[in-house]
Amino acid sequence: LRPEQVRHCTDNREEMQRARHAFELAASGRRVVVVSSGDPGVFAMAAAVLEALHESTDAEWQRVDLQVFPGVSAALATAAKAGAPLGHDFCLISLSDNLKPWAIIEKRLTHAAAADLVMAFYNPISKARPWQLGSALEIIRQQRTPTTLVVLGRDIGRPGETLRTLTLGELTPELVDMRTLVIIGSSQTCRFPRVDGGEWVYTPRSYPPL
C-alpha cells in the first residue's frame, strides 16, 4: 500500500457491513476499492455492493461512480488447470446454507444431477457444516455412476496449489475443505494422459442424441 492508502479489513461474514462502509467512504469523496477474490460477481462482493446500493435511500450513494471489474473465479481457474471440464453445459452451486435453505440446495442438486450438467461446488464443507458435502454426494450418486470424473482444486493460483482428479466413487468429504473447489463431471466428461505424466480432463462440446 502507498502511504496515503488505508486498508479496512473485515471477515467473510461481514459483506454487507463492508459494502455499506465502502459507499460511505466513496460518498464522502474518497476513492474506494472493494477487493474480492476470484470474480467479484460470482459468490463474492459485487452482489453485496449492489444489494447495499439497492437498499439505500442516500442520494449520495446513487451518485457514486460504481464499476465492477471481472476476475477469474475458482471454477474457471480449476477447470483451466485440469483442462476443460466445463467445456459443455455446467452450473455453479454454493453448498453453504448461510443465506439460503438447505432444501433449496438439495432441489438444485437433484435437478442438476438429473440434467447431466457438470457441477462446480463452492463452499463445499466447513467446520460448522461438515455433513453437507456428504449429503450432496448422496443426491448426486443417485444419478451419476461411480466412474464419473471429479476434479478437486485447492488454492488454485496461490502458493501451494493442488489439483487432483479422481472418481465419484473415490470422493469422500475428508478429501475436501473450505478452500477446495469441487467439479463433478457429467456422463461425457473424460480424461487422457499427458506426455508429462499427468492427465487432461475435459467435457466434449457435443452431446450424444437421446
Descriptions of predicted regions:
Residues 31-32, 114-210:
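A contiguous loop/helix-start segment that scaffolds small-molecule binding in enzyme catalytic cores
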Residues 6-9, 66-68, 92, 150-152:
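Conserved beta-strand scaffold positions in the cores of enzyme catalytic domains, especially
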Residues 1-66, 209:
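Class I S-adenosyl-L-methionine
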Residues 41-115:
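Class I SAM-dependent methyltransferase SAM-binding "motif I" and its flanking Rossmann-like core
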Residues 1-2, 46-48, 80, 132-133, ...:
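Short amphipathic alpha-helical segments
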Residues 13-18, 74, 98-100, 157-160:
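A short acidic, often aromatic-flanked loop/helix-cap motif at beta-alpha or helix-coil junctions
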Residues 14, 18-21, 45, 49, ...:
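General structural feature for long, well-ordered alpha-helical segments within catalytic domains
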Residues 21-28, 80-84, 105-109, 163-169:
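Short, surface-exposed amphipathic charged segments that create phosphate/polyanion-binding patches used
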